[in-house]
Swiss-Prot record:
Binding site for ATP 1: G206, E207, P208, G209, V210, G211, K212, T213
Signal peptide: none
Keyword Coiled coil: yes
Recorded coiled-coil stretches: 391-525
NBD2, as annotated region: 559-768
Region (C-terminal): 769-859
Residues involved in ATP 2 binding: G609, P610, T611, G612, V613, G614, K615, T616
Repeat 2: region residues: 83-146
Domain of life: Bacteria
GO biological process, one term: protein refolding
Region of interest called Repeat 1, as start-end residue ranges on this chain: 6-71
Protein name stated in the entry: Chaperone protein ClpB
Length: 859
């Protein structure tokens, strides 16, 4: 027996058999242990070969286990166990069979043949299960495909297509693929390339999420349905699993052997198999080690000769980075460009997928939800592509509704929490013996009984609604299964079965579904329903809001009233400046009502005016109004961008420079918070080149950062503030607004280029503040102090006379409202801080600030 000529797979089986014999306290290594090791190994192919030969494999396994259990046991056996005489005889027969077949190595399938030839106990088990020398020989010939075993790893290369590929056409027959809607031109172009004599390899190139893999699935469905030219009919479409090819390839050359096995199997198939390689750029460099070939180079000859019918898919960037660099590989593929579908096409795609998602989640998806998913994803999710991003919205909204359906409704949850609270209170009150506690106990018992009854009623309604909903979902699932069976029966030509399924089973299920839907509608009025069972446009809008931070939910009456009273709300923080507040309010109302140009920012303004008149404060008030938080204000001090090279800090350093990976300050902030107020403060202090990057933002609402990513500014309000022309505003005072603006604009035109001014929606001039304005600002600022004192359980009351003194002390026509803050600090906060530290005011007391001549006094 030539032990050195055993294949790696059979050597592994012998080692495993040795372990089994030791574990069973066997006296010898019997042939039965080797057979068990082969049958237990999923990758050995022994079980498949026996099944191919018509042997009852489960019977073999059962009888074999009984035989091994009956063998004599030797306790305390140490070291290796020697092969029994029967096993040595079987191994010798294997050697003879290998020589007869001209094999260089002895493969594990010859062990099965030798067992049948040898008339020992294990051989009898095989014969009783239906094994004969003739049918085992025939099965070996079928498995080998006419090839000899010429190297130790020959068994690993068998059935390479089964191990390293997935059959898409079989999945299409089983109804496991989603329907592919549209994309006819791309599928037709791919078929056209596949029918060429040479270089018949299409590569689908497009952005991530546009549906490249779906096109291949569509082709698989067409092949199964016979909707392809004659030359492609009955072909198999397999997906190459490159990860499985590479995984576990420990030794040099092992990966190449596996790939060669796949190529050999494809060559044997004589062009009846198409192979799809997703992310085809991963072939370039796959399996590459020092001096070894990579997968891309191994595929080139087969691709050029037309032996390998390959369909590739990759993104534009990766095609350029990997495939285009290798000109020899590139010329073997024919490009099929896959563009992003339009919103209308996406709606059609979603309607095609609607039923699959309804069955998966067990809920209904309405048509308005489908339209909203396509339109809102196109408008607000700008860094991804249709239809993928629209499908994601539908999937996530459906998942959310399903989660709500499977958990306790909010109304019941509130009652549950209240009951827990009351029971805890009852436990404490029961310990008390006074009359008040007894009365309280009666009230608690009464409330608990009422809530328990209400909870029981709601629980009954919820369970009934859930049962109806689950029943309808189950019927939908059965309908889908019947439809798949109808398609399979039609393909097999079994028209009798197809008509039975269609006119009996399907009609019966459709009636059941209609009845279930009627029961769902009649069970409770929509207002009283505890369960939400469908996805509408509002659910989609909620998901978009959560994903992007953009409030796109349908405008409620409260928000409409809020927008109509926007000036009033902003004037609570910004005193005077009626023209500025009106201009900003009009821009926001235009955008929120859907009348503004969707491809531009919500509004772009240039605020001009002297220091301290409320330019920056209006931006803060606007951010607070729109988002209930000033965190959505992106403030950039333009005095930091006085040098020409500082532009790179806004959009990110170009490739090759330090900080390239970090991105730009402005672009990164807007990517994270796409719905923001952008304040470019003191804009006239920036270098003129900074304005060049703003032109694109103001006109198209987008900006390309240093890494080539397009950042969307369409949901931002851009405000630039400047002190240009402030001397004219101070000299002319509060005269005719248009006259002041005309004079100031002359200075603006000298500083900014015409193309910059032309792109700004509105230039707003802020006028100086008068004594009354300062008095009103003092009231606003003192409210902030009142809130801080409230935290210390103190109240603040400022008399009108005291307010006049503060306003007078804080009034300066040149510096605006900023001196007022200093006046409040010196006149009120400083003396008050000393008094508080001295302990002059007890908690809950009121601090009154009154006038005492020209000074203030505290009481």
């Amino acid at each position: 027996m030539r032990y050195d000529k055993l294949t790696a797979k059979f050597q592994q089986a012998l080692a495993e058999a040795q372990s089994l014999a030791l574990a069973a306290d066997g006296s010898y290594l019997e042939a039965g242990f080797v057979l068990k090791a082969l049958l237990d190994d999923q990758n050995s192919g022994a079980a498949a070969l026996l099944a191919h030969a018509g042997v009852n494999v489960p019977q073999v396994k059962q009888r074999l286990q009984q035989h091994l259990n009956s063998l004599p046991k030797v306790s305390g056996q140490g070291g290796d166990i020697l092969p029994s005489r029967e096993l040595q005889a079987v191994l010798n027969l294997m050697d003879k069979a290998a020589t007869k077949r001209s094999d260089a190595y002895i493969a594990s399938e010859l062990f099965l043949l030798a067992l049948v030839q040898q008339n020992d106990a294990t051989g009898k088990i095989l014969k009783e299960a239906g094994a004969t020398e003739q049918n085992i020989n025939a099965a070996i010939d079928a498995v080998r495909g006419g090839q000899n075993v010429n190297d130790a790893n020959a068994e690993d290369q068998r059935d390479a297509l089964k191990k390293y590929t997935l059959d898409l056409t079989q999945r299409a027959r089983d109804g496991k693929l989603d329907p592919v809607i549209g994309r006819d031109d791309e599928i037709r172009r791919a078929i056209q390339v596949l029918q060429r004599r040479t270089k018949n390899n299409p590569v689908l190139i497009g952005e991530p999420g546009v549906g490249k893999t779906a096109i291949v699935e569509g082709l698989a469905q067409r092949i199964v349905n016979g909707e392809v030219p004659e030359s492609l009919r009955n072909k198999r479409l397999l997906v190459l699993d490159l990860a499985a090819l590479i995984a576990g390839a420990k030794y040099r050359g092992e990966f190449e052997e596996r790939l060669k096995g796949v190529l050999n199997d494809l060559a044997k198939d004589d062009g009846n198999t198409l192979i799809f390689i997703d992310e085809i750029h991963t072939l370039v460099g796959a399996g590459k080690t020092d001096g070894a070939m990579d997968a891309g180079n191994m595929l080139k000859p087969a691709l050029a000769r037309g032996e390998l019918h390959c369909i590739g898919a990759t993104t534009l960037d990766e095609y350029r980075q990997y495939i285009e660099k290798d000109a020899a590989l590139e010329r073997r593929f024919q490009k099929v460009l896959v563009g992003e579908p339009s919103v209308e096409d996406t709606i059609a795609i979603l309607r095609g997928l609607q039923e699959r998602y309804e069955i998966h989640h067990g809920i209904d998806i309405t048509d308005p939800a489908i339209v909203a998913a396509a339109e809102l994803s196109d408008r607000y999710i700008t860094d991804r592509f249709l239809p993928d991003k629209a499908i994601d919205l539908i999937d996530e909204a459906a998942s959310r509704v399903k989660m709500e359906k499977e958990t306790k409704p909010e109304a019941m949850d509130k009652i549950d929490r209240r009951l827990i609270q009351l029971r805890m209170e009852k436990a404490h009150v029961e310990k008390e013996k006074d009359d008040a506690s007894k009365k309280r106990l009666e009230l608690i018992d009464e409330e608990i009984n009422g809530l328990q009854k209400e909870y029981a009623d709601l629980d009954e309604i919820w369970k009934a609604e859930k049962a109806i909903s689950d029943g309808a979902a189950n019927i939908k699932k059965q309908i889908d299964e019947v439809k798949i069976k109808i398609e399979q029966a039609k393909r097999q030509g079994d028209l009798a079965l197809a008509s039975k399924l269609m006119y009996e089973d399907l009609e019966h299920l459709e009636k059941q579904r209609a009845a279930a839907e009627r029961a769902d509608t009649d069970s409770t009025k929509p207002a009283n329903k505890l369960l939400r069972n469908n996805v509408g446009a509002e659910e989609i809008a909620e998901v978009v809001s959560r994903m992007t931070g953009i409030p796109v939910s349908k405008m409620m009456e409260g928000e409409r009233d809020k927008l109509l009273k926007m000036e009033e709300v902003l004037h609570r923080r910004v005193v005077g400046q009626d023209e500025a507040v009106r201009a900003v309010s009009d821009a926001i109302r235009r955008s929120r009502s859907g009348l503004a140009d969707p491809n531009k920012p919500y509004g772009s303004f240039l605020f001009l005016g002297p220091t301290g008149v409320g330019k920056t404060e209006l931006c803060k008030a606007l951010a607070g109004f729109l988002f209930d938080s000033e965190d959505h204000l992106i403030r950039i001090d333009m005095s930091e961008y006085m040098e020409k090279h500082a532009v790179a800090r806004l959009i990110g350093a170009p490739p090759g420079y330090v900080g390239y990976e970090e991105g730009g300050y402005l672009t990164e902030q807007v990517r994270r918070k796409p719905y923001s107020v952008i304040l470019l403060d003191e804009v006239e202090k920036a270098h003129p080149d900074v304005f060049n990057i703003l032109l694109q933002v103001l006109d198209d609402g987008r900006l390309t950062d240093g890494q080539g990513r397009t950042v969307d500014f369409k949901n931002t309000v851009i405000v630039m503030t400047s002190n240009i022309g402030s001397q004219h505003i101070q000299q002319m005072g509060i005269q005719d607004y248009e006259a002041v603006k005309e004079v100031v604009m002359e200075d603006v035109k000298e500083h900014f280029r015409p193309e910059m001014i032309n792109r700004i929606d509105e230039v707003v001039v802020f006028h100086g503040l008068d004594q009354d304005n300062i008095r009103n600002i003092a009231k606003i600022q003192l409210k902030g102090l009142e809130k801080r004192l409230e935290k210390q359980n103190l109240r603040l009351a400022v008399s009108d006379a005291a307010l006049d003194i503060i306003a007078k002390a804080g009034f300066d026509p040149i510096y605006g409202a900023r001196p007022l803050k200093r006046a409040i600090q010196s006149e009120i906060e400083n003396p008050l801080a000393k008094a508080l530290l001295a302990g002059n005011y007890a908690p809950e007391s009121e601090i009154r600030v009154e006038a005492d001549g020209d000074r203030l006094k505290f009481a």
